Regions:
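Divalent metal-dependent phosphate-bond-processing catalytic cores, especially two-metal-ion Mg2+/Mn2+ enzymes
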Residues: 32-33, 49-76, 89, 142-248
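His-Asp-centered metal-binding catalytic motifs of divalent-metal-dependent phosphohydrolases/nucleases
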Residues: 80-99, 105, 109, 130-138
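An active-site-proximal "capping" alpha-helix that borders the catalytic cofactor pocket
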Residues: 64, 105-117
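Polybasic, lysine-rich low-complexity intrinsically disordered segments
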Residues: 4-5
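Hydrophobic, well-structured mid-protein blocks that either form specific transmembrane helices
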Residues: 116-149
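Aromatic (phenylalanine/tyrosine) cluster motif
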Residues: 25-28
Length: 248
């Protein structure tokens, strides 16, 4: 009897330790109810502020949060609610890439997001974290993220600029800017300066190929590198099909 009781207590203790360990290394199990509560509220705020840019639509916001969720698994110390809020609200102010105040958009989005969150009784102690994560997510703003939450959001947003979806977003955005697909005679810019404002294909080498090296987390870098190969392979194939040899 004593032996059975001892074994039962040991099993219960082991289960408790496993549960504690899981809680430590998987923060979503502790915060899931809070995230579930806030996700529809954040979606409502984000949807109300969306424009007509399909490269920065609600699907983009969902993908950024999905990417961030993957990175959060590697960073249990991060505040998942701060990351979720910044993931969904980072584009509340979204100026075109050729707009003269594009570099200010993330600061404007951060200020608007914090005002709206405060009105929704979002935890006040988390607002500064959300503000910083939104301000520093932008490539155009060129602001360094100083918190793990901001690093995760920046990586998550930039990962969506890579891979097959990133490629589609690239050409969609280029069309909105009236850019040509590629330079007629030199698509790979072998004998000319890169110009991604004039030629969509140039954007891969000008910016996107550099993103993996700028990732803030190891997990983000690994995801970015795996997706970059899709763009570089496309660029090579595109150039082969695009360049037409002069008739003999």
């Amino acid at each position: 009897m004593h032996k059975k009781m001892h074994l039962a207590k040991s099993a219960a203790l082991q289960a408790a330790l496993c549960h504690t360990s899981a809680s430590v290394f998987h923060p979503f199990r502790n915060m899931q109810s809070l995230l579930t509560l806030w996700q529809p509220r954040l979606l409502a705020l984000a949807t109300a502020g969306l424009g007509d840019d399909s490269a920065h639509d609600i699907a983009h916001l969902h993908r950024v949060w999905r990417n961030a969720s993957i990175l959060l698994e590697q960073h249990p110390e991060a505040d998942a609610l701060v990351v979720m809020a910044a993931s969904y609200l980072h584009d509340l102010v979204n100026l075109p890439k050729n707009h003269p105040e594009r570099h200010l958009a993330s600061r404007q989005a951060a200020a608007l997001a914090c005002r709206q969150l405060a009105e929704q009784d979002f935890p006040s102690g988390k607002l500064d974290g959300v503000r910083h994560a939104i301000e520093t997510h932008s490539f155009s703003a060129d602001l360094a993220p100083h918190t793990i939450e901001a690093r995760i959001v920046q990586d998550a947003d930039r990962i969506d600029a890579l891979g097959a979806v990133g490629l589609a977003r690239l050409f969609y955005t280029a069309a909105r800017m009236d850019s040509a697909l590629a330079h007629g005679a030199d698509p790979l810019a072998l004998q000319r300066p890169l110009n991604d404002k004039a030629y969509a294909l140039d954007h891969i080498e000008t910016k996107l190929a550099k993103l993996p090296g700028k990732m803030q987390t190891q997990a983000g870098r690994a995801l970015a590198e795996s997706r970059l190969s899709i763009l570089t392979d496309f660029r090579s194939t595109f150039a082969q099909e695009w360049t037409i040899a002069p008739a003999a």
